[in-house]
A protein has these predicted regions:
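Acceptor-substrate binding/catalytic loop of class I
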Residues: 176-193
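A short acidic, Gly/Pro-enriched loop at the edge of an enzyme's catalytic core
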Residues: 113-122
Length: 239
């Protein structure tokens, strides 16, 4: 039975990713940007939290791009999502690629937090918060899922004019990097808002990095510029 908490999802957002599910592992598809940034975010997470031997949860795992990579770094990874088709793609890829120590479940972060509180060394929630009706609820669940002293990593889009121009006008309408309608500007989250969400539930900010894209070279890099895409590293207050 679906619980109230598991309804923190926009049906239209689920439909978007379900329609594109078969493209998740096509590096020339709409998911090409995720494949391009994956090594950067993976290395950043690993540099701060050391994945090897850790129990990791990837919230909003989609087709498993990050979950698969973290498992290959030596972590035992659970990917959680509510998009059935995307999860099937993730499971099939793990089987075909023989990825060790990775599994997937169709469950919300909120419901998993009730089932397995304080169970993970590391929780990641990447490129998801801007797609849900209640991001604070997701942040709260992530804080409940991680062990005291454990790490929670987020990535999302800042909310300002530059982010609107680059992430929506540029990426969706001019360059065609993403399908039109992928993002809604009103759902973008400023770093200060996300930091506030975290502090309310015992997550202390440890690091923040911007993610820059050069449309000419089609390359990405981490930087101090957080005006568009950014990654936030937090730690759960130890008891």
């Amino acid at each position: 039975m679906q619980t109230l908490k598991s309804r923190n999802v926009d049906p239209a957002e689920l439909a978007k990713f379900s329609d594109l599910a078969h493209h998740w592992w096509d590096k020339t598809s709409e998911f090409a940007p995720l494949h391009a940034i994956n090594p950067l975010r993976l290395d950043w997470i690993n540099s701060l939290a050391s994945l090897s031997g850790k129990r990791v949860l990837d919230v909003g795992c989609g087709g498993g791009i990050l979950a698969d990579a973290m498992a290959r770094k030596g972590a035992t990874v659970l990917g959680a999502d509510l998009a059935t088709k995307s999860l099937k793609v993730a499971q099939l890829h793990a089987l075909e690629a023989q990825t060790p120590n990775v599994s997937y479940r169709e469950i919300s972060a909120e419901d998993l937090a009730l089932e397995q509180p304080a169970s993970f060394d590391i929780v990641t929630c990447m490129e998801m918060l801007e797609h849900v009706p209640d991001p604070q609820s997701i942040v709260t669940a992530c804080a409940a899922l991680v062990k005291p002293g454990g790490w929670v990593f987020f990535s999302t889009l800042n909310r300002n004019g530059r982010a609107f121009l680059q992430a929506i006008v540029g990426a969706e309408y001019v360059l065609g990097m993403l399908p039109r309608g992928t993002h809604e500007y009103a759902k973008f989250i400023t770093p200060s808002e996300l930091a506030t969400f975290g502090r309310k539930v015992g997550l202390e900010i440890q690091a923040i990095r911007g993610l820059e894209h050069n449309p000419l070279t089609k390359r990405y890099k981490l930087s101090s510029d957080t005006r568009v895409n950014y990654l936030l590293a937090t730690q759960k207050t130890a008891i």
